[in-house]
């Protein structure tokens, strides 16, 4: 059985990065969270952990 990983924060799941701008007009990445159906699945635990640290979420393991 292959394990999959998702990133969760406040009962929502990480789905993508969007663009945001700071007060000086510089572009920065903004994490977008949505329902479980739109979530990104990771097959690598290390990739999920790295992304979770960038978006202030936690890694959830999905079996199946």
UniProtKB/Swiss-Prot annotation:
Domain of life from the UniProt record: Viruses
This protein's name: Uncharacterized 7.3 kDa protein
Source species of the chain: Acholeplasma phage L2
């Amino acid at each position: 059985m292959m394990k999959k990983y998702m990133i969760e924060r406040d009962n929502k799941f990480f789905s993508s990065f969007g663009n945001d701008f700071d007060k000086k007009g510089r572009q920065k990445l903004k994490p977008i969270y949505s329902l479980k159906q739109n979530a990104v699945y990771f097959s690598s635990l290390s990739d999920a952990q790295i992304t979770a640290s960038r978006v202030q979420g936690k890694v959830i393991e999905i079996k199946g």
